[in-house]
């Protein structure tokens, strides 16, 4: 699963708010809701967040293995 927890920490360190994302990066309120809910967003959005916050992808997202998810068959 993808976590956006690093995004919120990066925003706090940079003194950015969701309003900053909307104004500086033209990130829509619906996209911000998706981020808060942990839903998927486009790579264009991830790129815009990196640009706005002057950071890398690792500062925005983290991959968390889903231990409860069954392994996919090899075919």
What are the functions of these language-model segments?
Residues 15-33:
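Short alpha-helical DNA-recognition segment
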Residues 28, 39, 64-67:
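The DNA-recognition helices of helix-turn-helix-type DNA-binding domains
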């Amino acid at each position: 699963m993808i976590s956006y927890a690093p995004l919120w920490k990066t925003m706090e360190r940079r003194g950015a708010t969701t309003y900053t994302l909307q104004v500086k990066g033209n990130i829509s309120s619906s996209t911000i809701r998706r981020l808060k809910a942990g839903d998927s967003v486009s790579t264009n959005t991830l790129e815009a967040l990196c640009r706005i916050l002057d950071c890398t992808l690792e500062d925005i997202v983290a991959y968390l293995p889903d231990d409860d998810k069954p392994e996919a068959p090899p075919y």
